[in-house]
């Protein structure tokens, strides 16, 4: 069982657009939604599922809109919420910004989309690329000779339409890894992991098949093999285009890609990561007068690599004033609204160490520090480098017309949730 009706409301609870799918819930029931939501909010008991009588309201908020689904019987809640988020995604791809104004400007196309997205309360066609084939931005169906059914009906490859042509055939592949790190005040790594993804931008004619090979040291969990220098990927998720049966047999990632931009796969490595940028800080507080910081930043990756746009965010007391800075490289800025100083280094080569000193005045009567000390956080991006060591060995493009295509591969390592606690 899924949704009876779907509504889009403004912030006051006024219905902008709605679609009744099953006819078993009075459409005026939605008038109870906003009063119940405000009441629960005041009580501090707000929930994503609200109830009035026998009707359930499942809702999400996006910008200045509420998307609400109603149901009278036992609904599959996870399915309904997945559908609501999919509606947001599809509408955003059509209108770029999903907000009250874009709803008011596109009533016709939204009704068409709601008819295709769900049928009798069950999600149907939710792939925006398929929807864009026969629901255009102007809200009129494409007329190309005889009416044709959507790709999902005629084509086994529902994520890619036929007849795509490019003058220049190219594929761009990005291996992006984010490092999550938490270091204790005494320098012990408490938590470290790598969250990676392979993202692609595909501009290829026809119906090409791509084969991607990763380096031999990469293992997928449950391979049953263990090497000391292997990289064992966990929580691997593939785009629907990947032929899983072939992958299960020989670990080849073979697929017919969607057109344009998409995420081919994501993965995680729950492994000990040597901190790429190490921070040591000494903070001296002189009672009722001043506080001094000495912060040392060291890059702990190979000399041939360089971290770009490094930002080191150092928390300072709310009542600090009269800042003075001295640094061996980069620039330092005080951001009083965030109670922090930001040390920016545009280019930070591997194997280097830099120093920054800061001095602040303190009021004679200090505010009591009840919240403890926030950690130092670091932002960075290292091109041509992956922490895990994952590499693309080959990317083959096979298409029956035999055209030549250019594959471009790049690697990026960046910060995720990267924090170092202070003494």
Swiss-Prot record:
Phosphothreonine PTM sites in chain numbering? 152, 154, 223
Statement: the UniProt record of this protein carries the keyword Membrane: yes
Q: Which PROSITE patterns has this protein been placed in? A: CLAT_ADAPTOR_M_1, CLAT_ADAPTOR_M_2, MHD
Q: Which GO terms describe its cellular component?
A: AP-1 adaptor complex; cytosol; early endosome; lysosomal membrane; synapse; trans-Golgi network; trans-Golgi network membrane
Pfam families referenced in this protein's UniProt entry, alphabetically: Adap_comp_sub, Clat_adaptor_s
- Where does this chain mainly localize? Golgi
Q: How does it sit in the membrane?
A: Peripheral membrane protein
Ranges where the MHD domain occurs: 168-421
Q: Name one GO biological process term.
A: endosome to melanosome transport
Residue numbers carrying N-acetylserine: 2
Localization per Swiss-Prot or TrEMBL: Golgi apparatus; Cytoplasmic vesicle, Clathrin-coated vesicle membrane
Q: Which UniProt keywords apply?
A: Acetylation, Cytoplasmic vesicle, Golgi apparatus, Membrane, Phosphoprotein, Protein transport, Transport
Q: How is it modified after translation?
A: Phosphorylation of membrane-bound AP1M1/AP1M2 increases its affinity for sorting signals.
Entries under InterPro entries matching the protein: Adaptor_comp_med_subunit (IPR050431), AP2_Mu_C_sf (IPR036168), AP_mu_sigma_su (IPR022775), Clathrin_mu (IPR001392), Clathrin_mu_CS (IPR018240), Longin-like_dom_sf (IPR011012), MHD (IPR028565)
| Role | Subunit of clathrin-associated adaptor protein complex 1 that plays a role in protein sorting in the trans-Golgi network (TGN) and endosomes. The AP complexes mediate the recruitment of clathrin to membranes and the recognition of sorting signals within the cytosolic tails of transmembrane cargo molecules.
Q: Which family does it belong to?
A: Belongs to the adaptor complexes medium subunit family.
Subunit composition? Answer: Adaptor protein complex 1 (AP-1) is a heterotetramer composed of two large adaptins (gamma-type subunit AP1G1 and beta-type subunit AP1B1), a medium adaptin (mu-type subunit AP1M1 or AP1M2) and a small adaptin (sigma-type subunit AP1S1 or AP1S2 or AP1S3). Interacts with MARCHF11.
**Name assigned to this protein:** AP-1 complex subunit mu-1
């Amino acid at each position: 069982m899924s949704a009876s009706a779907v509504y889009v409301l403004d912030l006051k609870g006024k219905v902008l657009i709605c679609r009744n799918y099953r006819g078993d819930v009075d459409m005026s029931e939605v008038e109870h939604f906003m009063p119940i939501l405000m009441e629960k909010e005041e009580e501090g008991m707000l929930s994503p599922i609200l109830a009035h009588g026998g009707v359930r309201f499942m809702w999400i908020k996006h910008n200045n809109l509420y998307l609400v689904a109603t149901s009278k019987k036992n609904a599959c809640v996870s399915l309904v919420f997945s559908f609501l988020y999919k509606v947001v995604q599809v509408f955003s791809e059509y209108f770029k910004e999903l907000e009250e104004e874009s709803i008011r400007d596109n009533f016709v196309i939204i009704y068409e989309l709601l008819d295709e997205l769900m049928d009798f309360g069950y999600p149907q066609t939710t792939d925006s690329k398929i929807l864009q084939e026969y629901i255009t931005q102007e809200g009129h169906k494409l007329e190309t000779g005889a009416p044709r059914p959507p790709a999902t009906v005629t084509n086994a490859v529902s994520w890619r339409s036929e007849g795509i042509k490019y003058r220049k055939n190219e594929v761009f592949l990005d291996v992006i890894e984010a490092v999550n790190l938490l270091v204790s005040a005494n320098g012990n790594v408490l938590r470290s992991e790598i969250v990676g993804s392979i993202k692609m931008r595909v501009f290829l004619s026809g119906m090409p098949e791509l084969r991607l090979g990763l380096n031999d040291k990469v293992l997928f969990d449950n391979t049953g093999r263990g090497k000391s220098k292997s990289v064992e990927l966990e929580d691997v998720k593939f785009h629907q285009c990947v032929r899983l049966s072939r992958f299960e047999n020989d670990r080849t990632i073979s697929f017919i890609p969607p057109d344009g931009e998409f995420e081919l796969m994501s993965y995680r490595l729950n492994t000990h990561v040597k901190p790429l940028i190490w921070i040591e800080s000494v903070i001296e507080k002189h009672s009722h007068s001043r506080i001094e910081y000495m912060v040392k930043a060291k890059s702990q990756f190979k000399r041939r690599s360089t971290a770009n746009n490094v930002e080191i965010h150092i928390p300072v007391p709310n009542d600090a004033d009269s800042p003075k800075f001295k640094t061996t490289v980069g620039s330092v800025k005080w951001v009083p609204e965030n109670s922090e100083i930001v040390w920016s280094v545009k280019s930070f080569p591997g194997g280097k160490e830099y120093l920054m000193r800061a001095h602040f005045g303190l009021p004679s009567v200090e505010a009591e520090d009840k919240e403890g000390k926030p950690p130092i956080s670091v932002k960075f991006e290292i091109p041509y480098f992956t922490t895990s060591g994952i590499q693309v060995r080959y990317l083959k493009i096979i298409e029956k017309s035999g055209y030549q295509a250019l594959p471009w591969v790049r690697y990026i390592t960046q910060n995720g949730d990267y924090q170092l606690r202070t003494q």
